[in-house]
Every structure is written in C-alpha cells, then in structure tokens.
C-alpha cells in the first residue's frame, strides 16, 4: 500500500500514527518501517518498536528475526526471544534455529540451552527437530 511505502521513507512518523489504521495496514506499515529503521541501526529499530503495542511489537520482532536468520542468527534468536506471544515466540525461535543449525549446529544448540524463555520441554522439542532435520539430510540415496 502507499502508506507502507511511506513507512519505508518516514518510519518514525508512520509508527507514531499506527493506531489510525486498520490491522492489515498496520502490519504492512510495521514491516516496512522495521526494514527502514534496521538499516540505520539495530538500536534505532529497538527504540522505536518498543513504543508499539505488544501485538505490533510481535509483528516487528518476528519480521526482524526472519530477516536476520540467514545473516546473523544469534541476533535473530535474540530478537525472537523478545516476542511476547509464547506461541509466536516459539515458532520464530524454532524457525531461526532450523536455519542456524544448517551451518552452525553447536551455536544453535547452545542458544537453545542458554535460553531462559524456553521451557525444558520446548528446548527438547526444538533440539529433536534439529536432530531429525540433520539426520534426514545425511541420508544417502541410491
């Protein structure tokens, strides 16, 4: 939408007015503004995003985590841990760790083990998903 495009250029202004728009427009604005803010610095991104409602923060954090998962998985994991909604947080962490474990399994497993936001059963579930993913990728087909 045109409003989302404006958010790419004027993220602070658009986020300050976020409550004036419908939920689907808010989501697009948040995504575009997140990219624009993160280009400046991660600190700018976090400062502005922290002023949003919890639901809108979750959208921004999930988007940013997905964006970082290929280039900076540790930071992606850290951002995913900021998500308030437990189900969304778990999905985002699992997604990040699945990508991360493809090129640095040890670091991914360490991040899971060190997380204070994941329960023991969630840690076990994510770890087993990684093991299954790695096992299936090591199968040699005739």
Residue ranges of each PLM-predicted region?
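Non-catalytic all-alpha helical scaffold/repeat segments
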Residues: 1-142
């Amino acid at each position: 939408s045109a409003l989302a495009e404006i958010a790419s250029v004027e993220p602070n202004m658009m986020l300050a007015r976020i409550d004036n728009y419908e939920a689907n427009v808010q989501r697009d604005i948040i995504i575009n503004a997140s990219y624009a803010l993160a280009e400046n610095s991660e600190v700018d991104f976090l400062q502005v995003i922290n002023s949003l409602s919890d639901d809108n923060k979750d959208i921004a954090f999930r988007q940013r985590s997905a964006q970082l998962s290929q280039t900076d998985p540790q930071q992606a994991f850290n951002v995913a841990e900021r998500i308030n909604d437990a189900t969304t947080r778990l999905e985002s962490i699992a997604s990040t760790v699945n990508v991360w474990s493809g090129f640095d399994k040890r670091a991914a497993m360490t991040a899971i083990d060190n997380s204070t936001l994941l329960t023991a059963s969630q840690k076990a579930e994510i770890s087993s998903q990684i093991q299954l993913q790695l096992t299936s990728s090591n199968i040699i087909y005739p």
